[in-house]
Amino acid sequence: MDTPARLNDLQRTTLAIVLAGGRGTRLGPLTNKRVKPAVHFGGKYRIIDFALSNCLNSGIRRIAVVTQYKAHSLLRHLQRGWSFLRGEMGEFIDLWPAQQRVEGAHWYRGTADAVFQNLDIIRSIRPKYVVVLAGDHIYKMDYTRMIADHAESGADCTVGCIEVPRMEAVAFGVMHVDANRRVTDFLEKPADPPCIPGRPDTALASMGIYVFSADYLYSLLEENISTIDTDHDFGKDILPRVVTQGTAIAHPFSMSCVSSDPNVEPYWRDVGTIDAYWAANLDLASTIPTLDLYDRNWPIWTYQEQLPPAKFVRDMKGLQGSGNNLIVCGGCVISGSQISRSVLSSNVKVSSFCNINEAVLLPQVTVGASCRLQKVVIDRGCAIPEGTVIGEDPVSDAERFYRTDDGVVLVTPEALRQKV
């Protein structure tokens, strides 16, 4: 039985490791300067804030963040916004950049190697359970429920899972489970994903969330590092090994998701493409968004820069603009323009006579007068020249910017020949 004392013990004996070193190549130019978990999301957040907030709200206050690729903006964000835990109480967010800590002098060669290279640090913390998390997904989850499920089952490893359309499962690890939720097979990013029996259009996908009994994890990593033919990856190497050698159980997301409406399907998004990133941002501007950011019982924490309030003013002719289904963050100034179904991040400035629809504007973007922007993502610091039109002519958009097959246009300072 999960009594408060029992849950508190699970929290105190758990170490969470957030993997935040991946580039996120499917996001194209958006990750040319920053690692994917550091990408801005929802106006005021970074993607990694969701995994870290889940840890904090779950009562897990011993956290490590593993970094490698272009980590400066991520490290700066963590140092400014996540340094409030009390070290004297045994709480911490440790930063583990690649340091060539083991023999061979190599950087992190995969997700499993990233954890292995810090094994001496992990052992010194002496956790009973280790939660390994991807730092690049958007969701709200009580990890303590998953840890309790792991402890009660007696499994060596517990894998968070969610049902997805079968053809979307090519981007995930896919598993088979028996009637007792035991994982019987695990395939990492299969070209032809197997379906859930009796449901030909649905697959059971890994969420990239694993709970390990600590001693078992140590032995797995030490075995893997001595293996020649390996990618040193949790999905490709570690999980298949657990399935054949030990006991892995599946933990459905529905068992531990956090939602203010139990009738709504559990929200989990891999915003790994420009289309998915754009759509997930715009969903937040809906009248009733799928992801509730206003749940005071499960806040999403972040670094909050001290900015003046957002301001809406009349245009240069004295006419009033309009806006609906908008997220507008601190420091924004909107001058008499028509804006709908969009996300305006911190310090965005929009001049007069603009028409903006279905746009995600990242921090410090300025939009000149008389611009028309449709179905766009504007990267941080871009200055959109007066009279610019984006999103109306697919050929012109593709010649100037990064345009997806679904028609979302990503505008970067480099594409505008600007230096930020």
From Swiss-Prot:
Coiled coil ranges: none
Organism of this sequence: Paraburkholderia phytofirmans (strain DSM 17436 / LMG 22146 / PsJN)
Database matches in InterPro entries: ADP-Glc_PPase (IPR011831), ADP_Glu_pyroP_CS (IPR005836), GlgC_bac (IPR023049), GlmU/GlgC-like_hexapep (IPR056818), NTP_transferase_dom (IPR005835), Nucleotide-diphossugar_trans (IPR029044), Trimer_LpxA-like_sf (IPR011004)
Top EC class for this record: transferase
Binding site for alpha-D-glucose 1-phosphate: 108, 173, 188-189, 206
CDD domains in UniProt: ADP_Glucose_PP, LbH_G1P_AT_C
Enzyme Commission numbers on file: 2.7.7.27
Function: Involved in the biosynthesis of ADP-glucose, a building block required for the elongation reactions to produce glycogen. Catalyzes the reaction between ATP and alpha-D-glucose 1-phosphate (G1P) to produce pyrophosphate and ADP-Glc.
PANTHER family on file: GLUCOSE-1-PHOSPHATE ADENYLYLTRANSFERASE, GLUCOSE-1-PHOSPHATE ADENYLYLTRANSFERASE-RELATED
Superkingdom: Bacteria
Keyword set, alphabetical order: ATP-binding, Carbohydrate metabolism, Glycogen biosynthesis, Glycogen metabolism, Nucleotide-binding, Nucleotidyltransferase, Transferase
Assembly and binders: Homotetramer.
Entry similarity comment: Belongs to the bacterial/plant glucose-1-phosphate adenylyltransferase family.
Catalysed reactions listed for this entry: alpha-D-glucose 1-phosphate + ATP + H(+) = ADP-alpha-D-glucose + diphosphate
One annotated GO molecular function: ATP binding
BP GO annotations: glycogen biosynthetic process
Pathway: Glycan biosynthesis; glycogen biosynthesis
Protein name, per record: Glucose-1-phosphate adenylyltransferase
Taxonomic classification: Bacteria, Pseudomonadati, Pseudomonadota, Betaproteobacteria, Burkholderiales
Signal peptide: none
